[in-house]
Amino acid sequence: MQQSPQMIPMVLPSFPPTNNITTEQIQKYLDENKKLIMAILENQNLGKLAECAQYQALLQKNLMYLAAIADAQPQPPAATLTSGAMTPQAMAPNPSSMQPPPSYFMQQHQAVGMAQQIPPGIFPPRGPLQFGSPHQFLDPQQQLHQQAMQGHMGIRPMGLNNNNGLQHQMHHHETALAANNAGPNDASGGGKPDGTNMSQSGADGQGGSAARHGGGDAKTEGK
């Protein structure tokens, strides 16, 4: 309690200008503020409210003086920003920077245009986008059905499959058998006289016999 009256004359003198303040003086005011706080706590415990109010007024003046010194000092954050410190605005992504540059869209447009100018002969058309004749995209079953229909109509593609080759051989075999069966019939037909030849030969025989009979009659009349 004896130290508190000694602290009051230390803070009563006027404060020096804030422009000429040194770090040692600032540290001195900080130490005095610490002592004032300790004195205020002791007086509160003892119930001396008047002394507490006096020390609180001195503490408030010291704090305001230190705040004025801080405001008078040059702002160091400007130097830290130039050295590469990131501010919240710098850390936030810029929406315009996330968008691709206009040259990107130009390159994409040129690539699409070049793809449309490629002649169709270089790359064969494929996919469901080609709306040509329906026979261009037939599945294997429909192709086999068309080939079978062509086979019935007499248009047999050579080398279609093994079944067509077997059918072709069977067709030749049946033709050969039919030719062999027709040979004996023709031969027997050639050996047998038909009805016209038989009738002609009969008529010739009858004519000859009639002539011979007429000759016999003439001879008897001459006698």
Swiss-Prot record:
InterPro entries: SS18_N (IPR007726). Keywords: Activator, Transcription, Transcription regulation. GO terms for molecular function: transcription coactivator activity. Predominantly expressed in shoot tips containing the shoot apical meristem (SAM) and flower buds. Also expressed in mature flowers. Residues 179-223 are annotated as: Disordered. GO terms for cellular component: nucleus. GO terms for biological process: cell division; leaf development. Residues 214-223 have a biased composition (Basic and acidic residues). Interacts with GRF1. Belongs to the SS18 family. Transcription coactivator that plays a role in the regulation of cell expansion in leaf and cotyledons tissues. Component of a network formed by miR396, the GRFs and their interacting factors (GIFs) acting in the regulation of meristem function, at least partially through the control of cell proliferation. GIFs are involved in the positive regulation of cell proliferation of lateral organs in a functionally redundant manner. This is GRF1-interacting factor 3. It comes from Arabidopsis thaliana. The gene is GIF3.
